[in-house]
């Protein structure tokens, strides 16, 4: 997609009404187009308004991208002649910007060669690549059981404290190492504290350099919980625009959205103020369209790919709620983080039975990978079914066959753990990026009983099977 040209400044209007985040502006001359950005100054600060509706002959209804406190009727507003334009390119790496592309990390101005409009059309059918490829992450449990599609969309489900952020950071790190790709993180309705923690953790784990520049691998775009709904409804698009630029440069980009539910929630807040009649559970009537317009832009083209990992909050654990239900329709894979696995000390705490992927198909991953993954899942499923018997009667009451299955399942569980690069700081063990062939080979040997003689402890927090064998020798010698 071509870079947008520098817009011509259009007509000047005046504020006629302010209702929270919605501002009406009257123009005497030409009316600005829908989605155009209007600018005014509010208490000495640049305030951007986005045109949402045309009312009558000379009035437009707009959504404010920042607080509208202090705005008065009669105040001058100018049309920029284009949608919101944000800086894109390598200069954005390691920096934090807001919905309108202004840096908010106190590391100086953000000057880039290109700016790009946040509203873009999805790539045409001709531009899209239809080839099904998996994106190897170097994380065993993901690559084996719920592989990510290159240019696919992954839903990341998990409560507080089970390791969503660490998994996100490891993915950023591994994609940069294995594919030389960049990442973009969009914090949508995030807690400011969490956003700040993520920024500093990225610097500590060498994902980014302080103040951006050479060596940084991720660009951050934040619209926190305290921002008006206009900013939260558009910040995901700002992040996506930065990611699209990298994709069009031929990169494999990882695009993180935390949290996709807040994008919908912000849209519903704005919708009511715009006078739209709400639909089911009070959501905006345009829910599916808003979600579809954003999700369709996340795709693989013939030049590069955007692979999106979206954290999804499920209100009241109700998966039939319109917001998560609309998100599910777009997902290619789900990675479910489980508290019960985290409690066993197994990290990443990915649930091997609940996580799914449409890429786990013999036509895509090959017969061997598919067979090994299914055997691993059936062994773990059998262990899960036997757990009640073990808890009541103990291991001795099981048949010999079941005892072997349980022993293998426990080894598989431990072998699904692995040390992360970004966790080196607090675990003290060096991170491991495991090649897909090594992952398949290791688990194939495990389910076929080749490693039944090795102790359970040898499989915990190692990378490849060779390391597990080495660890077993050390344990035997100790």
Curated annotation (Swiss-Prot):
E.C. numbers: 7.1.2.2
Top-level EC class as recorded in UniProt: translocase
Subcellular location: Cell inner membrane
CDD domains named in the record: ATP-synt_F1_beta_C (cd18110), ATP-synt_F1_beta_N (cd18115), F1-ATPase_beta_CD (cd01133)
Record-linked Gene3D superfamilies: 2.40.10.170, Bovine Mitochondrial F1-atpase, Atp Synthase Beta Chain, Chain D, domain 3, P-loop containing nucleotide triphosphate hydrolases
Residues engaged in binding ATP: 158-165
Catalytic activity annotation: ATP + H2O + 4 H(+)(in) = ADP + phosphate + 5 H(+)(out)
GO cellular component: plasma membrane; proton-transporting ATP synthase complex
Entry annotated with the keyword Translocase: yes
Pfam families, per the entry: ATP-synt_ab (PF00006), ATP-synt_ab_N (PF02874), ATP-synt_VA_C (PF22919)
Description of how the protein assembles with itself and partners: F-type ATPases have 2 components, CF(1) - the catalytic core - and CF(0) - the membrane proton channel. CF(1) has five subunits: alpha(3), beta(3), gamma(1), delta(1), epsilon(1). CF(0) has three main subunits: a(1), b(2) and c(9-12). The alpha and beta chains form an alternating ring which encloses part of the gamma chain. CF(1) is attached to CF(0) by a central stalk formed by the gamma and epsilon chains, while a peripheral stalk is formed by the delta and b chains.
Recorded family membership: Belongs to the ATPase alpha/beta chains family.
NCBIfam families per record: atpD
HAMAP family, per database record: ATP_synth_beta_bact
Protein name: ATP synthase subunit beta
Organism encoding this protein: Rhizobium leguminosarum bv. trifolii (strain WSM2304)
């Amino acid at each position: 997609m071509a870079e947008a040209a520098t817009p011509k400044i259009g007509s000047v209007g005046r504020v006629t009404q302010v209702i929270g985040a919605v501002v009406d502006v009257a123009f005497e001359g030409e009316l600005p187009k829908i989605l155009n950005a209007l600018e005014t100054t509010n208490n000495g600060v640049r305030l951007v308004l986005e045109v949402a509706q045309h009312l009558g002959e000379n009035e437009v209804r707009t959504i404010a991208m920042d607080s509208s406190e202090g705005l008065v009727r009669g105040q001058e507003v100018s049309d920029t002649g284009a949608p919101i334009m944000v800086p894109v390119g390598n200069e954005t790496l390691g920096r934090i910007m807001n919905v309108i592309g202004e840096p908010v990390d106190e590391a100086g101005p953000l000057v880039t060669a290109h700016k790009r409009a946040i509203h873009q059309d999805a790539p045409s059918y001709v531009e899209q690549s239809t080839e099904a490829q998996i994106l190897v992450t170097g994380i065993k449990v993901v690559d084996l059981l719920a592989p990510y599609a290159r240019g696919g969309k992954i839903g990341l489900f998990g409560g507080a404290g089970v390791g969503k952020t660490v998994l996100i950071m490891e993915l950023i790190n591994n994609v940069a190492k294995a594919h030389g790709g960049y990442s973009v993180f969009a914090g949508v309705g995030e807690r400011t504290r969490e956003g700040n923690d993520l920024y500093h953790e990225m610097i500590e784990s060498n994902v980014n350099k302080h103040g951006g520049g050479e060596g940084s691998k991720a660009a951050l775009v934040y619209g926190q919980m305290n921002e008006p709904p206009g900013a939260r409804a558009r910040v995901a698009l700002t992040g996506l625009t930065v990611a699209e630029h990298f994709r069009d440069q031929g990169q494999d980009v990882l695009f993180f959205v935390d949290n996709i539910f807040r994008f919908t929630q912000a849209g519903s807040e704005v919708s009511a103020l715009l006078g739209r009649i709400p639909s089911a559970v009070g959501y905006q009537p345009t829910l599916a369209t808003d979600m579809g317009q954003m999700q369709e832009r996340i795709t693989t083209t013939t030049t590069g790919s955007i692979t999106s990992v979206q954290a999804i909050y499920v209100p009241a654990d109700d998966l039939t709620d319109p917001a998560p239900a609309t998100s599910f329709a777009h997902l290619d894979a789900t990675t479910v983080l489980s508290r019960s696995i985290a409690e066993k000390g197994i990290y990443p705490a990915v649930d091997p039975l609940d996580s799914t992927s449409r890429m786990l198909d013999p036509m895509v991953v090959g017969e061997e990978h598919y067979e090994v993954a299914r055997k691993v899942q059936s062994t773990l499923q059998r262990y899960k079914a036997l757990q009640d018997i073990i808890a009541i009667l103990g291991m001795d009451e099981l048949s010999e066959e079941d005892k072997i299955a349980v022993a293998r399942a426990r080894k598989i569980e431990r072998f699904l753990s692995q040390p992360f690069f970004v966790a080196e700081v607090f675990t003290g063990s060096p991170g491991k990026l495991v090649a897909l062939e090594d992952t398949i080979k290791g688990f194939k040997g495990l389910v076929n009983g080749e490693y039944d003689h090795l102790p359970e402890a040898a499989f915990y927090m190692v990378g490849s099977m060779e390391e597990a064998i080495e660890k077993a020798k050390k344990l035997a010698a100790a």
